[in-house]
Amino acid sequence: VEDFNYIFARYEKMGIVGNNGTGKSTFIKMLMGEVEPDSGRFDVGETVRFGYYSQDGLQFDEQMKVIDVVQNIAEYVDLGDGKKMGVSQFLNYFLFAPEKQHNYVYKLSGGEKRRLYLCTVLMRSPNFLVLDESTNDLDIVTLNVLEEYLRNFKGCAIVVSHDRYFMDKVVDHLLVFRGNADIKDFPGNYTQYREW
C-alpha cells in the first residue's frame, strides 16, 4: 500500500470490504501489531484496548460453565458513559438465559459457542473492536443483538464482512480493498458503494 494515511476517530464504525486475497486480514493484523508492515507504520494510542473477534475463534475449557468462562475475564463490562453491566445480565443480553448460563460449555451448540466467544471479546471492555468475519457463524437473532450493541458502542469498530445487510446497518464508511495494494476510503455504507 502506497501513500495511504488514515486516522480513526472516536465512535467511528468502519467496514472493510474486498475480494479474498486483497489484504484485508493482513491489514487487521498490522493494525493490531501482529504483523510488521514492510514500510510505513501504524501508530496506536496508549489507551487503545483492542477487542478482536476472528474467524478462528477461541478454544474453551469444555468442562467450565458458561458464566465462569466470562466471569474469569471480568465481573462486569464497561458500556461507556459510566455504565456497567454485570456478567449474568450481559450474558442474558446476548441470549444466554439464566439457566443456560450454568450449563457446561461442552453442552453448547456450535452457534452458542461462537456467541460465547463474542461475549468473551466484549467482556474485556475494548474501546477499539475488530470483528473479522463475525457474521459468518452467528444466527439472525444474535446478529440483531450485535447490531444493537454496535450502535451503542462507545468506541471505534472495524467490521470485515461479506454480509451487506449487516454492514449497511452498522458502518458509516468503508475501506475498499481493490487488490494490488489499492485501498479506497469510501464515505458511506456498502449499498451506497455498490450504487456508486
Where are these regions (language model features)?
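ABC ATP-binding cassette signature C-motif
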Residues: 1-196
